[in-house]
């Protein structure tokens, strides 16, 4: 579907109300209001398409480079050669309908891939299981910055099929040090692979070496991992996300937790716009989680959650302290930190750096005390945040099963509904159960350290039982404290 963009006159974006609100059924209508139903923007604010001279230079991967698009051999070297050949003058490279096996495809400046409708892209067979693998790389792991590059489905959507590979560590596109890019028009068939399928990445190079000015749109994904999903944005400026859909996981995860950004003291996201973000049977369509990064403004319109835990999840920024003493256990490190900051100051202890180091997350109420403490073991680390942001036209539909639930969410599900939940088995990752509500916002919304405002307006809430807590805040009382041991296994 092609976006119909309208010109804008104030900055690069305008949000306009058209039409009326839908009928709302909810036990708490205080947050329901008339909201915009479409986010309209000038396409040129995000991406400039190739000019006529570039479009006139066309090559075909099969007829010009001899790729067999019917076998199962690795086609990466020939595709990389074709991209390199076109990069000097710029051009369009067509991948005719067929099957291609690809890995480590290096995108270059002024090269635009047009992949015909119905084409299937597979990761190369026999990839090393323990390593991370990228099909397309927009200057994330390569050295040079690139400009003016795109991958789009031609005539309809192509397919990226991640299923059945020897490696579960699969990334469809890693978008790094690139300006003016577009990724559009395909379907991802997943099987809960590790990583979000599209990473909007920080690169630890000189300057602001991360994505600027781009569009990611018209992509749907099936069977995503709850801990990942379709998109994760670490660092980006002036990006539009449009018409994205995911089954499972998180569709648009604005979680800026790349540790390289913490060391470099730069990165994060600014001027992010999104519209038509949907998730079915997942965790949530939209997630804000700044970790340690100070991020800019995010504007989102038209969010749909069907059978998800929540439609919008907002997490406070936090201080994360690493165990430089390499203690033997999580409890030992927790006791050390709480000996400095006081009982209850550690929210959770977990492993970072590929399981090599204990990390303690400081509880939100202790952020100020930790930041200003005299002990250098805990002081001086500032929790992250977003600038005041907006999510409008949120639609949440209840389903009695299929939602992916974090353990911490279960306290807000009435005890009478616990029979609808099953716990992870040996191969599981998350609890499964009913939709829980519309929003969960763990920020104090007072602009103290790690806290910020995401203003959410809802246009349609359907099917939730009357005793559900639809909008959970940081101080919402828990409604069920039953032991989780009685919940039966999903497997």
Curated annotation (Swiss-Prot):
Disulfide bridge positions per record: 422-490
EC number: 3.2.1.157
Main location group: secreted
Transmembrane regions listed in the UniProt entry: none
Localization: Secreted
GO biological process: cell wall organization; polysaccharide catabolic process
GO cellular component, one term: extracellular region
Catalytic activity field: Endohydrolysis of 1,4-beta-D-linkages between D-galactose 4-sulfate and 3,6-anhydro-D-galactose-2-sulfate in iota-carrageenans
Cleavable signal peptide: 1-19
GO molecular function, one term: iota-carrageenase activity
Family: Belongs to the glycosyl hydrolase 82 family.
Function statement: Hydrolyzes iota-carrageenans, sulfated 1,3-alpha-1,4-beta galactans from red algal cell walls, with an inversion of anomeric configuration. Also active against hybrid iota-/nu-carrageenan, not active against kappa- or lambda-carrageenans.
Name of the protein in its database record: Iota-carrageenase
Gene: cgiA
């Amino acid at each position: 579907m092609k976006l119909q963009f309208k010109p804008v006159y104030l900055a690069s974006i305008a949000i306009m109300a058209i039409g009326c609100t839908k009928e709302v059924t909810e036990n708490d209508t205080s947050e329901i209001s008339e909201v915009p139903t479409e986010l309209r923007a000038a396409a040129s604010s995000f991406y400039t398409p190739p000019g006529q001279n570039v479009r006139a230079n066309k090559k075909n991967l099969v007829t010009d480079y001899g790729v067999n698009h019917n076998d199962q051999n690795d086609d990466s070297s020939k595709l990389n050669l074709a991209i390199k050949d076109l990069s000097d003058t710029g051009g369009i490279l067509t991948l005719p309908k067929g099957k291609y096996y690809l890995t480590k495809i290096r995108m270059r400046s002024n090269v635009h891939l047009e992949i015909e409708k119905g084409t299937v892209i597979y990761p190369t067979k026999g990839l090393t299981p323990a390593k991370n693998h990228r099909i397309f790389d927009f200057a994330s792991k390569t050295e040079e910055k690139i400009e003016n590059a795109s991958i789009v489905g031609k005539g309809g959507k192509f397919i990226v099929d991640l299923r059945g590979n020897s490696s579960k560590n699969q990334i469809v596109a890693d978008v790094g040090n690139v300006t003016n890019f577009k990724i559009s028009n395909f379907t991802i068939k997943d099987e809960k692979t590790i990583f979000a399928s599209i990473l909007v990445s920080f690169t630890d190079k000189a300057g602001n070496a991360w994505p600027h000015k781009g569009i990611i749109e018209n992509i749907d994904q099936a069977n995503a991992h709850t801990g990942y999903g379709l998109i994760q944005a670490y660092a980006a400026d002036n990006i539009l996300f449009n018409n994205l859909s995911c089954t499972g996981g998180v569709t648009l995860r604005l979680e800026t937790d790349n540790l390289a950004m913490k060391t470099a003291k730069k990165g994060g996201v600014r001027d992010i716009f999104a519209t038509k973000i949907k998730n079915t049977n997942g965790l949530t369509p939209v997630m804000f989680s700044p970790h340690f990064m100070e991020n800019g403004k995010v504007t989102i319109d038209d969010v749909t959650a069907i059978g998800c835990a929540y439609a919008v999840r907002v997490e406070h920024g936090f201080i994360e302290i690493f165990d430089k003493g390499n203690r033997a256990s999580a409890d030992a490190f927790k006791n050390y930190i709480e000996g400095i900051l006081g009982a209850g100051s550690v929210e959770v202890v977990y492993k970072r750096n590929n399981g090599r180091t204990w990390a303690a997350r400081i509880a939100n109420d202790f952020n100020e005390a930790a930041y200003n403490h005299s002990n250098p073991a805990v002081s001086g680390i500032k929790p992250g945040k977003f600038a005041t942001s907006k999510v409008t036209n949120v639609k949440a539909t209840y389903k009695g099963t299929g939602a992916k639930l974090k353990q911490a969410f279960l306290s807000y599900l009435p005890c009478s509904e616990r029979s609808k939940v099953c716990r992870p088995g040996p191969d599981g990752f998350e609890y499964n159960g009913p939709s829980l509500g519309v929003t969960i916002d763990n920020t104090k919304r007072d602009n103290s350290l790690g806290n910020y405002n995401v203003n959410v307006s809802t246009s349609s809430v359907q099917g939730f039982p009357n005793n559900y807590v639809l909008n959970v805040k940081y101080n919402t009382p828990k409604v069920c404290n039953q032991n989780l041991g009685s919940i039966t296994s999903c497997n």
